[in-house]
Amino acid sequence: MPGKPKHLGVPNGRMVLAVSDGELSSTTGPQGQGEGRGSSLSIHSLPSGPSSPFPTEEQPVASWALSFERLLQDPLGLAYFTEFLKKEFSAENVTFWKACERFQQIPASDTQQLAQEARNIYQEFLSSQALSPVNIDRQAWLGEEVLAEPRPDMFRAQQLQIFNLMKFDSYARFVKSPLYRECLLAEAEGRPLREPGSSRLGSPDATRKKPKLKPGKSLPLGVEELGQLPPVEGPGGRPLRKSFRRELGGTANAALRRESQGSLNSSASLDLGFLAFVSSKSESHRKSLGSTEGESESRPGKYCCVYLPDGTASLALARPGLTIRDMLAGICEKRGLSLPDIKVYLVGNEQALVLDQDCTVLADQEVRLENRITFELELTALERVVRISAKPTKRLQEALQPILEKHGLSPLEVVLHRPGEKQPLDLGKLVSSVAAQRLVLDTLPGVKISKARDKSPCRSQGCPPRTQDKATHPPPASPSSLVKVPSSATGKRQTCDIEGLVELLNRVQSSGAHDQRGLLRKEDLVLPEFLQLPAQGPSSEETPPQTKSAAQPIGGSLNSTTDSAL
C-alpha cells in the first residue's frame, strides 16, 4: 500500500546479533548470574541461562554466544566448537571433557565398567605417556594407584580445570572466529549449516564456484579453492599423512599447551589479561596454516607461573628488559599485596630470589610468593631501632629470638610494649597482630644488655641468618669491611707492608737469607758432626750437603717472614 510504511523483512530477534564483544560473554537477567563463573562440571547440571530475547529453537547458532554452557548444551554447537579446537591443536580438551561426561553417567555399582573407562581416560589424557595429554596443574595430578578404586567423580577436579580453560580462553576466540560468523550468516539467510569438518575453518559458502584460470596459468603454491581443503594441511596445501598428523599433534600440542593453556588451579582464578597474550600463540600458528583471520598480534614471550600466598595462581609474562620486581608489581597491586613484604621462591627451592635481576630467568618456571609481616623494634637500652620481618605464622617470641640471642637476653628479662603504653604485650601472639607497628623492647631493672659482636645487616634487622635473606638483602660492601679481619686474629697477623714485601723479594732473588740471628754468610754455615764425612775435614763446608743445608734456612726464613708479614 502506498500509505503503509514499509517493514524491513528482518524477523524479530535478528537485531540482537549485533552485539559487542563484551556482551557475548556477559548476560543479564536474574537467572543468568551464575553463568560466568565457570564452576559447572556436568552438562546435565549446567544452568538453563537467562531468558533469551529470541527463541533458541529457531536460532540455535545465535544462542551459542550467550554463554559457554549454552554452547555445550547444543550438540551441533559442541561439534562446531570441537572443529574449532582442532584447528588450534587443542581438541583433546573438549574430548577429555566429553569423556568425563560419559564417565559420570556410569552407575557406581558397575565397578567393572568404571575401572575400564577410568583406565582408558587416564592412559589417553592424564598419564605421563598419554597420547593426548591435557594441561592440568600439579595439584590435580593423579597417580595410577587411584585406578584401583574408581568412582564416577574421580576426575571431577581435572574436568573443572579443563572446563574453565575452554570457557575463559578458547570460547572467547570461538565466538569471534570466521567459523562462527559463517554459521551466523547462514542462519540469518535461512541456509542449512554444513557438517562440521566438511570445509576449511573460516571458508565461505561451499557453493562458491572455483575461479577460472587462463590456459597455462595455475594458482600459487599453497592456494586452493576455499572450502575444498582437507581439515589438516601441510606446507603447500598438501594433506598430511596420518603418521605426520599424529606426530604434529603430539609435538605441537605439547608446546602450545605449555604456553597457551594455563589452567592453574581448581579455583580458576586466572588473570584474563595475561591469557589475552597467550592466545596470540595459537593465532600466529593458524596464520602459518593459511588462516584468513586478521593481523596477528606481536610475538609473545614466555610465561612464569606465580603461586600467590592465598593459594591461587596467575600467569606473568617474562618480558626481556623487565626485572622480577617490575613483573610482579602488577600482580601484587591487583591482589592487594605489598611487594616489599613479599619473598619470591622457586618452587622446590628455599632460597629467595633477587628481585632486581632480569625476569627472563623465570621463563617457563614456577615461583611462589610468601608474605612477610614487618614491624619496627626500638631497643631503649641501645638507643637503636631495627626492622624485623617474619612469616605470618610466627609468634612474637620467635621473631624476637634472634635479637635476644644476639644481645645475650632471655624472654624473661625483657618487656615488650607499644610506645606510650605500659601494658606489656603477650609474646605468644602472632606477628600479624603488630603488622606495620612500632614496638618498644625494655629490659628489667638490673639486667645489662651486651653489645652484639656480629653487626651484619641481617642480624641487625632481627632475622635469622638464612640464605634467602642474604640473597634478598645483600649487605652493602664498605671499604673498611674489605680488609677487616676478626678481632681474635688481629694480634697475630699484621697488614702486609708493600715496601717490606718488595725488599723480601729482592733478598730472595739475590740468594740472601735471614733468620732471627741476622744475615747468614757462607763462613758461618758449619755442618754438625753427625753430617760430616769421616774422611773429610773442615773443607766439607763446600760439599753439596752444605748447599743443601744452606738452602734450608732460605725456605724456613722465607716462610717465617711471609707469615709475619701476612
Curated annotation (Swiss-Prot):
Any one Gene Ontology cellular component term annotated for this protein: dendritic spine
Compartmental location: Nucleus; Nucleus, PML body; Cytoplasm; Membrane
Domain RBD: 302-373, 375-445
Recorded superkingdom: Eukaryota
Residues bearing PTM Phosphoserine: S20, S42, S45, S199, S203, S218, S288
SMART domains noted in UniProt: GoLoco, RBD, RGS
Biased composition, class Polar residues, residue ranges: 39-51, 537-550, 557-566
Keyword Cytoplasm among record annotations: yes
Residue ranges, annotated region (Necessary for interaction with RABGEF1): 299-425
Listed GO MF terms: G-protein alpha-subunit binding; GDP-dissociation inhibitor activity; GTPase activating protein binding; GTPase activator activity; GTPase activity; microtubule binding; protein kinase binding; signaling receptor complex adaptor activity
Biological processes annotated in GO: cell division; chromosome segregation; G protein-coupled receptor signaling pathway; learning; long-term memory; long-term synaptic potentiation; mitotic cell cycle; negative regulation of ERK1 and ERK2 cascade
Main location: nucleus
Keywords carried by this UniProt record: Cell cycle, Cell division, Cell membrane, Cell projection, Cytoplasm, Cytoskeleton, GTPase activation, Membrane, Microtubule, Nucleus, Phosphoprotein, Repeat, Signal transduction inhibitor, Synapse
Disulphide linkage map: none
Pfam families linked to this entry: GoLoco, RBD, RGS
Region Disordered, annotated ranges: 19-58, 192-243, 451-490, 530-566
Domain RGS: residue ranges: 67-184
Listed InterPro entries: GoLoco_motif (IPR003109), RBD1_RGS14 (IPR046992), RBD2_RGS14 (IPR046993), RBD_dom (IPR003116), RGS (IPR016137), RGS10/12/14-like (IPR046995), RGS14_RGS (IPR037881), RGS_sf (IPR036305)
PTM statement from Swiss-Prot or TrEMBL: Phosphorylated by PKC. Phosphorylation is increased in presence of forskolin and may enhance the GDI activity on G(i) alpha subunit GNAI1.
Record's subunit section: Interacts with GNAO1, GNAI2 and GNAI3. Interacts with GNAI1. Interacts (via RGS and GoLoco domains) with GNAI1; the interaction occurs in the centrosomes. Interaction with GNAI1 or GNAI3 (via active GTP- or inactive GDP-bound forms) prevents association of RGS14 with centrosomes or nuclear localization. Interacts with RABGEF1; the interactions is GTP-dependent. Interacts with RAP2A; the interactions is GTP-dependent and does not alter its function on G(i) alpha subunits either as GAP or as GDI. Associates with microtubules. Found in a complex with at least BRAF, HRAS, MAP2K1, MAPK3 and RGS14.
Comment, domains: The RGS domain is necessary for GTPase-activating protein (GAP) activity for G subunits and localization to the nucleus and centrosomes.
UniProt cross-references to PANTHER family, sorted A to Z: REGULATOR OF G-PROTEIN SIGNALING 14, REGULATOR OF G-PROTEIN SIGNALING LOCO
Protein's name according to its UniProt entry: Regulator of G-protein signaling 14
Species of the source: Homo sapiens
Phylogenetic placement of the source organism: Eukaryota, Metazoa, Chordata, Craniata, Vertebrata
